[in-house]
Amino acid sequence: EHYGFRGHEHRAAEKFLSQQGISKPSAPILAPEFTNPLFLKTCCQALRQNKQTSFPKGLNSITSLFEFYVDSIERIVARKKKFNPQENIVKSILIDIASKLLPDNLDGLPKHDVRKLINNYDPNPNFGDSLFDILIDEGILSEDISYKEEQRGNLIVRFTYERFSDYFIAQELVNKVDRIEIAFSNGGSIWQLLKDNGYYRF
């Protein structure tokens, strides 16, 4: 496991940003993902690509930070694959993957399925590396080995950051219901999902 800047978070992140020519945020970003060197490197790369030297204001919430990160990946991948980042191809891929994780695949999806899913989104499949390989290389997705009994030892692909996965899964759940209070109430769709899978047992 990679522990990033753990134990020296603010000092190490500040030094890294300085080396990248990026000003540190005016307000501390407390999300643990911000202490991960790969996460921070991706954000800095996107800023430099846009000729920016500072982070936008308002990254203090998880939602704003993750949206900024996805936008960063989107711009980097769009440049490599020659498409318009406003097409939101990467975001569409992540939403599609998240929709297939619940309820039985929270650890990840079979690699061959994810490769096919991602490459179906590729607007320029004959240009450069495959979209699947680029997303793995950029670190937004990771390859792993399944430990589920029926798939033990098989290669799977998952979101690199667990909270990032949680964020997209939560968005998918909420987007599928008309009234959130009913979905969480006794017998509602989300209530039933949590109950059946024992996600919140006390």
What residue spans do the PLM features occupy?
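Extended hydrophobic
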Residues: H2-R179, F184-K195
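Extended alpha-helical scaffolding segments used for macromolecular assembly and cargo binding
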Residues: D196-F202
